[in-house]
Curated annotation (Swiss-Prot):
Statement: the UniProt record of this protein carries the keyword S-adenosyl-L-methionine: yes
Alphabetized Pfam families for the sequence: Methyltransf_25
Protein name: Trans-aconitate 2-methyltransferase
Gene field: tam
InterPro entries per UniProt: Methyltransf_25, SAM-dependent_MTases_sf, Trans-aconitate_MeTrfase, Trans_acon_MeTrfase_C
SUPFAM superfamilies: S-adenosyl-L-methionine-dependent methyltransferases
Source organism (scientific name): Escherichia coli O157:H7
Single biological process term from Gene Ontology: methylation
Length: 252
């Protein structure tokens, strides 16, 4: 599990793209020339940006070679760069930085967010969506299984919080629009939940385990999911998935 799996990630493409669509709808820009899609993955969010601004120069950034290869194949009219978001520098100031479900993987948001704002043109926009599910059963149970089986904590940090992000971006010279939405995804089984998180949040927990250790982890995780996510009357499972949205426009 050394690299991301584009096929597994795109298995829930509609559910993963919906927050990107809703974030993009709130971006208050009509015409843009330079756009960066940070953590572009296989290009599903980049495609939305290209549809809205077909004449713009859009650059997708991702640290995964597999994801970059998939994105380049899908969107030959866009530019893609394999790089760490924290170290990448654009060739010119940007009109829009779009980051859909990527920045939650990076530490030090008190430094990262002002840095990203500094890459914007005056009146440029930083648009961010981050999963806010650190306290949801899907992620709490990952930590509990790891503790039970004596594995180190490899999960990502919790988000800083609404008030913290508002202050960070206001102090960086931005007008800030911030909101939180909880999606309820209909899942056909508890295994489907595992398939979902295996492509993202569960990756760091499994990546250094042997095949047999992974199986033990997933078996126990599956048992605990059944306790936390009851079946609906029609046999479906509702997976609550909170997400934090931020649209910050540079005014200084």
């Amino acid at each position: 599990m050394s690299d991301w799996n584009p096929s597994l990630y795109l298995h829930f493409a509609a559910e993963r793209s919906r927050p990107a669509v809703e974030l993009l709808a709130r971006v208050p820009l009509e015409n843009v020339d330079y756009v960066a899609d940070l953590g572009c993955g296989p290009g599903n969010s980049t495609a939305l940006l290209h549809q809205r601004w077909p004449a713009a120069r859009i650059t997708g950034i991702d640290s995964s070679p597999a994801m970059i290869a998939e994105a380049r194949s899908a969107l030959p009219d866009c530019q893609f760069v394999e790089a760490d978001i924290r170290n990448w520098q654009p060739e010119q100031a940007l009109d829009l930085i779009f980051a859909n479900a990527s920045l939650q993987w990076l530490p030090d948001h008190y430094e990262l967010f002002p840095h990203l704002v500094s890459l914007l043109n005056p009146q440029g926009v930083l648009a961010v969506q981050m999963p806010d599910n650190w306290l949801e059963p899907t992620h709490v149970l990952m930590r509990e299984v790891a503790w039970e089986q004596n594995y180190p904590d490899r999960g990502r940090e919790s988000l800083a919080g609404v008030h913290a992000y508002y202050d960070i971006l206001s102090e960086a010279g931005c007008e800030v629009d911030i909101w939180r939405t909880t999606y309820y995804h209909q899942m056909p089984s508890h295994q489907a939940i595992i398939d979902w998180v295996t492509a993202t949040g569960l990756r760091p927990w499994l990546q250094d385990l042997t095949e047999s250790e992974q199986q033990l982890f997933l078996t126990r995780y599956h048992q605990m999911l059944k306790e936390q996510y009851p079946l609906q009357e029609n046999g479906q499972i509702l997976l609550a998935f909170p997400r934090l949205f931020i649209v910050a426009r540079r005014t200084e």
